[in-house]
């Protein structure tokens, strides 16, 4: 009897370390996976921060507006925001919310949804003259020589600067509303084409365009 008990104890002792070692390996794998997940999450957060840091936001106007409902008037704020990376991308957004911060956030999100790519020349100007209209507002923009700067005012200047244009002449015609002027400037920028693209559309050479 003593021999059988001793054998059974020796078997239990020899078999017990195996599952313990397996559990230790599983725990180490879980720790490694969790660490890897944390590193991936940090990398994605850094990438998102870098992308957000490329964009600049400027608030053109904040107004308190009201909406007539069944129970009376509902007050809210409207924010007009221009978003751009100064590298040829710019957008204008409008946001409405019960507070100013919420309205600005919605305006930024709306501006990033309506981005326009602007072809820039080596001297940070535009390739050709362009005219844009929105409602009663009309904006005329034309290229300028290096060192001219941004000759524009109001919301038009903000749109041109955040697009990365540093030498341009702009003239406002018609309405003075900031939103209409900003949108008219966006239309004018969206109509811009490089000389190469224009030649391709017309089916002619670049020499014929310059001549």
Swiss-Prot record:
Region Disordered, residue ranges? 1-55
Function (record text): With S4 and S12 plays an important role in translational accuracy. Located at the back of the 30S subunit body where it stabilizes the conformation of the head with respect to the body.
Q: What is known of its domains?
A: The N-terminal domain interacts with the head of the 30S subunit; the C-terminal domain interacts with the body and contacts protein S4. The interaction surface between S4 and S5 is involved in control of translational fidelity.
Q: Does the keyword Ribonucleoprotein apply?
A: yes
Gene that encodes the chain: rpsE
The family database entries (InterPro entries) matched by this protein are listed as:
Ribosomal_Su5_D2-typ_SF (IPR020568), Ribosomal_uS5 (IPR000851), Ribosomal_uS5_bac-type (IPR005712), Ribosomal_uS5_C (IPR005324), Ribosomal_uS5_N (IPR013810), Ribosomal_uS5_N_CS (IPR018192), Ribsml_uS5_D2-typ_fold_subgr (IPR014721)
Q: Which residues form the S5 DRBM domain?
A: 55-118
Top-rank taxon: Bacteria
Q: What is this protein called?
A: Small ribosomal subunit protein uS5
Q: How does it assemble?
A: Part of the 30S ribosomal subunit. Contacts proteins S4 and S8.
- An example molecular function term from Gene Ontology annotations: rRNA binding
Q: Where is the composition biased (Basic and acidic residues)?
A: 1-12, 28-39, 46-55
Q: Which family would the database say this protein is a member of?
A: Belongs to the universal ribosomal protein uS5 family.
List UniProt keywords, sorted A-Z: Ribonucleoprotein, Ribosomal protein, RNA-binding, rRNA-binding
In the record, biological process GO terms are: translation
Any one GO CC term of this protein is: small ribosomal subunit
Task: Report the coiled-coil segments.
Answer: none
Q: By its UniProt entry, which NCBIfam families does this protein fall under?
A: rpsE_bact
């Amino acid at each position: 009897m003593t021999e059988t008990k001793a054998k059974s104890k020796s078997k239990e002792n020899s078999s017990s370390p195996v599952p313990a070692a397996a559990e230790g390996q599983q725990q180490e794998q879980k720790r490694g996976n969790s660490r890897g997940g944390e590193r991936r999450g940090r990398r994605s957060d850094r990438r998102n921060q870098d992308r957000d840091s490329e964009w600049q936001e400027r608030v053109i106007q904040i107004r308190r507006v009201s909406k007539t409902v069944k129970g009376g008037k509902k007050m809210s704020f409207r924010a007009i925001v221009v978003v751009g990376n100064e590298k040829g991308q710019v957008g204008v957004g409008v946001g409405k919310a019960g507070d100013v911060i919420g309205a600005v956030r919605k305006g930024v999100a709306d501006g990033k949804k309506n981005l326009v790519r602007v072809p820039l020349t080596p001297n940070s100007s535009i390739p050709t003259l362009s005219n844009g209209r929105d409602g009663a507002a009309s904006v005329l923009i034309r290229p300028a020589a290096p060192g001219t700067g941004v000759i524009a005012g109001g919301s038009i200047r903000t749109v041109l600067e955040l697009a990365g244009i540093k030498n341009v002449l702009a003239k406002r015609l018609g309405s003075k509303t900031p939103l209409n002027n900003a949108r008219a400037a966006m239309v004018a920028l969206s109509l811009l084409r490089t000389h190469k693209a224009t030649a391709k559309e017309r089916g002619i050479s670049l020499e014929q365009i310059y001549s």
